[in-house]
A protein has these predicted regions:
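Residue-level detector of beta-strand face positions
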Residues: 59, 122-126, 207
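Short aromatic/basic micro-patch
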Residues: 29-32, 73, 104-105, 153, ...
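Peri-transmembrane interface segments
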Residues: 189, 200-218
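Small-residue-enriched segments and motifs
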Residues: 69, 132-133, 206
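Short amphipathic alpha-helical segments
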Residues: 7, 67, 168-172, 204
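Hydrophobic, regular-secondary-structure patches
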Residues: 1-70, 74-80, 95, 112-113, ...
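Mid-to-C-terminal secondary-structure elements
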Residues: 77-92, 100-201
Length: 218
């Protein structure tokens, strides 16, 4: 988690209706439009970037090898926001997102499982039967918290088109402009989402985590 950077925030859906008590009768999911709103430099001057994530479990295959993992559909800015460099190859870009290209950056665990003795770059993997071409391998992050190396990352548009369908997103990664502005960025994110979702403290259908709270959760 520490490798993600002290200026990372993570927004996830949260249902405030617990134990049979209806606190918010109109709970909303997180959407791509929420991520777009968080990128507003006027409303959120201390947010450097925000990227939606659509995550789902998949089984990926290459020739006679198979590996169960999760695919993350997201924007190109995800890599810089989450401090996720590649050790080989390249990232996908905005043109790839706009054209819904079926290309992927795979984590080191996936690379070792599907291509133990060969270079994965340029090779094709099928995730739930959908072909993706490997253009990059994410640098190893390590750690036992949700194994960040066991992942397949692809353009959000491609994942929605071919695997998940369209709708809500699983989370939004948010990068504050610096570690010193993380609290301000968190406040700006909450204010924007409160306005969009019609919520207040106690009825929020989302939760914002910072690095400290993520470490407590782990």
């Amino acid at each position: 988690i520490q490798s993600l950077g002290s200026n990372l925030l993570y927004v996830t859906p949260e249902n405030p209706n617990r134990d049979g008590e209806i606190v918010n009768p109109s709970v909303q999911e997180l959407t791509v439009d929420d991520a777009i709103a968080l990128n507003d430099p006027v409303r959120a001057p201390d947010i450097a970037g925000a990227a939606p994530e659509r995550r789902t479990a998949v089984t990926c295959t290459s020739e006679d090898r198979s590996h169960s993992t999760q695919i993350v559909g997201t924007w190109p800015s995800f890599f810089s926001i989450t401090n996720s460099p590649v050790s080989a190859g390249a990232y996908f870009n905005n043109a790839d997102e706009l054209s819904a290209r079926r290309i992927t950056v795979i984590g080191s665990t996936v690379a070792e499982s599907l291509f133990p003795e060969s270079d994965p770059l340029g090779r094709q993997i099928a995730c739930n039967g959908v072909p993706f071409t490997v253009v990059g391998v994410q640098a190893e992050k390590g750690g036992a918290f949700a194994n960040p190396d066991d992942v397949v990352i692809a353009p959000l548009s491609a994942v929605e088109n071919s695997i998940t369908g369209y709708g809500e997103v699983s989370a939004i990664s948010v990068q504050a402009s610096s570690s010193e502005t993380t609290d301000d960025a968190e406040g700006q994110a909450i204010a924007i989402l409160d306005e969009r979702h019609g919520t207040t403290e106690g009825t929020r259908d989302f939760e914002v985590f910072n690095q400290a709270s993520l470490l407590d959760t782990a």
